[in-house]
């Protein structure tokens, strides 16, 4: 997957290229990341990249000319098939379904705003989609962009090594993940569930699915609104709720 990022702080993206899953993906040639800094497209000696908003008010906006030129440079490098994404609180909220959709694109250009944002005409003429990572305020689009990159890259074939790792992540099937355990078998009086030590793969699968359903029921019940449970899932969830009521 090819990724271009428009940012005033390209150094921040070393967290993507140098570390963890995404760092290995870059090293192995599965992920290619390039940055364009609007400061490199300025024409004054101060490398000015902000400007005052029409109508007054607090704060500044990113200057149009350097930002637009940076986007054009990224588009020229990416090719016509690239999709331009602006990280914005006004965008569609990123969830696993959205991540899956974005992962179908082989080339993405991510525009990271700063200050109070960017000129609306840039969004109208240069941006294909707006995405948000949540209903809260951040200082810029870099952290949302890194969040999007990390989530999308996990779905690129070969990045995780085993596709099962991605398939078992929280939200991959619309549910929260089940609990996980490692050694020792007993920790401060808390034991690993016996079923996980049984070696019975079918029973382990059912336990994990039931725990995933139960955890979603307890913590994020609204997720069920978008799910059509199978007969097996419905039965397991009913059993979980019944057992919970008995132990209440």
Curated annotation (Swiss-Prot):
Q: Check the record and name the Gene3D superfamilies matching this protein.
A: 3.40.1280.10, tRNA(m1g37)methyltransferase, domain 2
Q: What class of enzyme is it?
A: transferase
Q: Name the keywords, alphabetized.
A: Cytoplasm, Methyltransferase, S-adenosyl-L-methionine, Transferase, tRNA processing
**Record-listed S-adenosyl-L-methionine binding positions:** 113, 133-138
Could you name the Gene Ontology cellular component terms for this entry?
cytosol
Q: What EC number(s) does the entry state? A: 2.1.1.228
- Give the family per the record: Belongs to the RNA methyltransferase TrmD family.
How does the record describe its quaternary structure? Homodimer.
Coiled coil feature spans: none
Localization terms from the record: Cytoplasm
Gene Ontology MF terms in the entry = tRNA (guanine(37)-N1)-methyltransferase activity
| Pfam families membership | tRNA_m1G_MT
SUPFAM superfamilies per the UniProt record, alphabetical? alpha/beta knot
Entry-linked InterPro entries? Alpha/beta_knot_MTases, tRNA_m1G_MeTrfase_C_sf, tRNA_m1G_MeTrfase_TrmD, tRNA_m1G_MTases_N, tRNA_MeTrfase_TRMD/TRM10
- Name of the molecule in the record: tRNA (guanine-N(1)-)-methyltransferase
Q: Which CDD domains match?
A: TrmD-like
What is the organism field in this record?
Shewanella sp. (strain ANA-3)
Q: What does the record give as the function of this protein?
A: Specifically methylates guanosine-37 in various tRNAs.
> In its keyword annotation, does this UniProt entry include Cytoplasm?
yes
Q: What is its main location?
A: cytoplasm
Q: What Gene Ontology biological process does one annotation of this record name? A: tRNA N1-guanine methylation
Record's catalysed reaction(s): guanosine(37) in tRNA + S-adenosyl-L-methionine = N(1)-methylguanosine(37) in tRNA + S-adenosyl-L-homocysteine + H(+)
